[in-house]
Amino acid sequence: MGRKRLVTNRRLVAIVDDEEDISVLFRDALKRIEGITIVPFNDPRIALEHFEKIKDAYVLVISDFRMPGLNGMELLRKMKDTNKYVRTILMTAYEIGDSIFSDYTKNEIINGFFQKPVRITDLIKEVNMQLHSYEIQKTFPSYPP
């Protein structure tokens, strides 16, 4: 008799950054959080393809802003269009136009933000908060009002 794998508790967290050292650093730091599987990507287009195949398994996407092929804000917008419950964090070392950024936060496309460099303790704290928010949103779909 074959062994069945339970995937119902599989909660994926994507890290999307074209700088491989950043995605590896974040992956290693977030391994400490129980109940999630970290999936690093260095190409936002590949991240989007993977996300679209198993969108309901993703609970959080952390993305850099400036990347070749597809910027982080557009990537997160496409992901939110596909799965409204997924939580998103944008990070950048650059300035972002206030009107564009406020539009994305107002429409809940971006749930969290980091200015690089990111302290690992801040990253872990924010990820835990976003995971908690995800669980609340899935349990109470009208939250927040």
Give each language-model segment a name.
Residues 49, 73-85:
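Short amphipathic alpha-helix used as the core "switch/output" element in two-component signaling
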